[in-house]
Amino acid sequence: MQTLREKIENIRFILLDMDGTMFNAAHRIDAETADVMRQLMDKGYYVAAATGRGLATLQPLLNPLGLRFNAPSVGSAGGEVGEAGCVGSERLFTHAFPREELLQLLRFVLSVGANFCTDGIGRVFVSEAAGTDTYQFKDSRIAKEMGCAYPEVVQLHTETLEQQLGEGEVFKILIWHENDAQRDAIFDFLEAHPGIHGFSTARTMMEALPTGVDKAAGVQIAAEKLGLTPAQCCVFGDSGNDVAMLKAAGLSVAMQNASDDVLAVADLVTDYPNSEFGAARMLQKLFLSEE
């Protein structure tokens, strides 16, 4: 069995979740964190995101600090692998929902009173009842002010759901539920449909993906494009959609603010939460320290 030092010395590729990990409490990257990312890349490490967000939606989050990763990123919780923050750029990998199961799931989510948004290429759909104050609309407005590209954000109306979706691919569905009854009903639906799986990512949020898609599979694809293996990857995460990649990576780090299922599988835990530069401080300690 490898020692911790041996695991650290074997790492060539560092991938970080964004919300709750790389991002601060305001869901933005601090200048200090961006600087650590650049130092790692300057030192020869590959650095990228492994996020539940769609890759094309990251532009307004990366642009203010001029941060550009030097390796393929994992987006939509594993549903896509490609260049982070680039609308219209070629994807190295995508895995979309089967069409009929997608429609059934969206209709069921609405029928129990929950809301959703979808990640795909070209458009982001948000259920009508969720309103226009969700982070997708907020980030879209920020992107417009900055003059950078962002997918079109569209409110999806129940009666025209199928027509509005058109033939566009959907990689991931983020679901907001108000209570345990809604959550349990949606999990029961997922269990009855073998082509879809899901997990909780926060107290009132969950994600649904095509079966076989998760961040671990995405990390493996991104690593292989660089001629590396998951054993040469260090990953950081904080919530349910990070568990698979933490189990698969050579070195796994949970945030201090992580959920219990993440803390249970990680090799290391940061000394500080995401609101106090926890990921950046741990990266400095592991890979940039002179000790």
Q: Where does each model-flagged region fall?
A:
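Conserved ATPase-coupling elements of RecA-like P-loop NTPase cores
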Residues: A25-I29
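Non-catalytic pre-domain segments flanking phosphatase-related domains
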Residues: M1-L16, D35, D42
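Short, structured coil segments at secondary-structure junctions
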Residues: L67-F69, A77, H193-P194, A248-A249, ...
